[in-house]
Amino acid sequence: VTPETLDHVALWVADRDPIADFVTSRVGMHVVDRTDAFTLVGSDARRGKLTLFEAEGPRERGALKHVALRVSKLDSALGSLDGTQVDRPRDGEAYMDVSEGLRLGLVEAPTEVEYDLDHVALWSRTPEETAEEYLGLGFSPASPGPSGAPRVEVGGAFVEFHQGEPGDPERPLLNHLAVLVESAEEHIAEARDRGLEIDNIVDAANTYAVFVWGPERVKVEYVEHKPTFSLT
């Protein structure tokens, strides 16, 4: 399995509009696509995005600690957050609670695209072991980040594993993590060969994807953009 980038983080939320309104008015994203089922937001359709799926509430944070976006100048980005309660645990980082348990971060680092995905932080009972298991899903090894938590890398973005209880909520906030691949068909064949637990295969208008259950019941999507993919 050879993912290219961290394509999106998908969430289940009871009301997607407050989150979509916040990220489009405060953190440089726009609505890439909206259907009856979901709203897709990002600063660039071909970079890291958030997918907000409508689902029955209330949702529980479960495995998801936070999602962090990358900016080249944090102070400038914070200027758009006037009136928002912001936590600054370390230099170059800021975190805020948005809605329905979603905690969003901003991390200062060199970036080709402002507000691209920097990292996703997950709770894990065994962070070191979980990071090791993600290598088998195509993620690359990486040194710990500023938080000191074990992490893996894909296309310059990271997944961090923080010591904590992910639980097994009936209505989790996190739907799945999605990585972009060249061929979903190859990943389907490899998943079957390796005995990975496939949750679903979806052949949609612009994408073709396979969903696999990862460690601690976090779902990973391997998604291929079809030639018809023209979202902006």
Residue ranges and their predicted role:
Residues 1-4, 10-49, 76, 122-159:
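Core segments of cupin and vicinal oxygen chelate
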Residues 5-14, 56-126, 143-146, 150-163, 188, ...:
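Vicinal oxygen chelate
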Residues 21-22, 27-44, 58, 65-96, ...:
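Acidic (E/D-rich), amphipathic helical modules within compact regulatory domains
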Residues 51, 160, 175-176, 221:
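Polar/charged side chains located within well-ordered beta-strands of beta-rich proteins
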Residues 43-46, 55-56, 154-156, 165, ...:
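Secondary-structure transition/turn motif
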Residues 49-51, 57-61, 112-114, 167-171, ...:
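A short local loop/turn or secondary-structure capping micro-motif enriched for an aromatic residue
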